[in-house]
Amino acid sequence: KLDLPRYFTLQRNGGIKTIISIGENKIALISGSENNCFFAALILLKNGNELMRTKCLPEEPKNNDFNGLGSSNIHLDDFLYLTLGTPEKHVSKNSPLAQNNEYLFGKVLRIKKNELIKKIDNQTKDLKIDIFSKGHRVPQGLTRINNSIFNVEHGPKGGDELNLIIKNGNYGWPLVSYGTNYLKENGGDGKSINFNHELNNFN
């Protein structure tokens, strides 16, 4: 039986986005809706306790959507790496979050596993989460080869990417992409995006 908080929502492409194992503990990244706020949260599945909650998405809930929030996670050494995408609805407001360090959307996040265990055991109030890299659109695949981290990312209307993820890397979204903007109903303009990452000093 899953113990999910009352704010958990399946509406607008919400749901459980990834499951994380820390020892015998199972943690879920979920979509939430509460008091006109759409957000993502990490919760402990055995009791529904909240370990982390993002800031609200900037668009009004009636106009928002969780499609593109999808996530993946890996363990490397003493850290958990977790991806969090930028929801695709109303890209004019949501996409810029990938470049904004005040938000966790559009990032590869890094969490010390011992700090996560302390949070699970109620030994600390706040869970420290580091932004490992940013400028991601929909980073739905994450894997490791030896000590290197690779990410598969969905581009807009084509332009999918395979990236080597490095600390403090900036992968350019929404300023550069190999894809094409969607049309106006999603906040786009249907035009191609600047695709040259290197000349624009992005990874």
Model-predicted regions and their roles:
Residues 1-92, 141-155, 203:
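Acidic, Gly/Ser/Thr-rich repeat motifs that build Ca2+-stabilized beta-propeller blades
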Residues 14-16, 86-203:
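Beta-propeller domain segments
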